[in-house]
């Protein structure tokens, strides 16, 4: 049963009637948010034995871990209010070691954690490389003007914390899009994209050496601009985003694996999991995402069982912009999961003021 089918009202009700002997949820991070229909339908399933598998048990905050345990072991971590008071709050806000250790002791008996290096000794090595993008003078002027304009608007924002946080995130998204290509923010401007130019240089070198490449972006319209570039250069490619029907999705994956196309353009959310694309030995992330675990899962479309060659992952990061600030958060995001699963330090959730500081520092 797919998650798309599960969250349909009629199918969800039908599946909730019997008591199943065993229920297994793969890619269980898809039910991390208790407010979603998908999560609510999953919680209604009755089973004597439940297993979940996920590469990202904590993507953003500990409330996600609470919801996963609500499925496999209801009541273990108490109500969400109790969990936030006893664990999430002290750990995320105050880096409380005692609370962290108590939570770890509670959940550890129910977790079997394996990292790739422990179970796949025969897998070729993976190399991660950050490529810095230098904005042109015109792009830098545009970015700084946009940054100042957004800061002025945010400084005038009134109202509750969550409302301000939403507006700050929207401003950050606009800056991130400007880092990719000015046309994504101001379509009427005819500024060339330094990031697209660097991408072209890297890609042509890879093609000259007979490599195949996966290209990920969070922005579908950014992928559209890259498609236009590939069309102009006569480069064969496959394409997949959230609007690609399942049957067509499989057809394009199979075609790429069979050698049809040297490049596969993929939206991060649509193709970051569940694909086997070992025909590629290079991965390019066009824009950094908040959570490095999501990028890692996308890179693992190439670096997985069946891969015979070393895999290289490039991340294109624009200098002196919001992208550098996001990359600096990656280490803290890794801490959030590792501190509970392995016992390291932890970072807290990001509030509106902390998000605003990312914009203030991104120049």
Predicted regions and their residues:
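ASCE P-loop NTPase motor core, strongest for the SF2 helicase catalytic module
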Residues: 1-95, 104-363
């Amino acid at each position: 049963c797919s998650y798309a089918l599960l969250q349909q009202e009629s199918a969800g009700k039908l599946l909730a009637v019997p008591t199943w002997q065993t229920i297994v949820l793969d890619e269980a991070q898809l039910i991390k948010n208790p407010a979603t229909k998908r999560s609510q339908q999953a919680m209604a399933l009755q089973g004597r034995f439940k297993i979940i598998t996920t590469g990202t048990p904590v993507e953003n905050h500990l409330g996600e871990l609470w919801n996963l345990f609500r499925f496999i072991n209801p009541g273990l971590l108490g109500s969400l209010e109790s969990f936030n008071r006893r664990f999430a709050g002290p750990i995320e806000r105050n880096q409380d070691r005692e609370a962290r250790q108590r939570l770890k002791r509670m959940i550890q008996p129910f977790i079997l954690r394996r990292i790739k290096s422990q179970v796949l000794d025969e897998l070729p090595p993976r190399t991660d490389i950050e490529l810095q993008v230098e904005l042109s003078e015109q792009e830098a002027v545009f970015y700084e003007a946009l940054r100042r304009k957004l800061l002025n608007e945010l400084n005038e924002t009134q109202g509750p914390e969550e409302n301000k946080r939403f507006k700050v995130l929207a401003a950050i998204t606009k800056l991130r899009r400007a880092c990719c290509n000015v046309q994504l923010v101001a379509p009427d401007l005819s500024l060339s994209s330094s990031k697209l130019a660097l991408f072209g240089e890297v890609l042509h070198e890879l093609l000259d050496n007979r490599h195949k490449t996966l290209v990920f972006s969070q922005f579908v319209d950014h992928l559209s601009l890259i498609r236009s570039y590939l069309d102009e250069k006569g480069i064969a490619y496959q394409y997949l985003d959230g609007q690609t029907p399942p049957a067509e999705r499989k057809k394009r994956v199979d075609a790429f694996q069979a050698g049809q196309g040297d490049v596969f353009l993929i939206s991060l959310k649509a193709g970051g999991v569940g694909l086997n694309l070992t025909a590629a030995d290079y991965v390019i992330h066009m824009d950094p995402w908040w959570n490095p675990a999501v990028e890692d899962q996308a890179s693992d479309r190439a670096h997985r069982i069946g891969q015979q060659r070393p895999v290289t992952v490039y991340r294109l990061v624009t200098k002196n912009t919001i992208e550098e600030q996001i990359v600096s958060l990656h280490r803290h995001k890794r801490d959030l999961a590792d501190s509970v699963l392995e016992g390291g330090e932890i970072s807290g959730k990001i509030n509106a003021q902390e998000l605003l500081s990312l914009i203030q520092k991104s120049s």
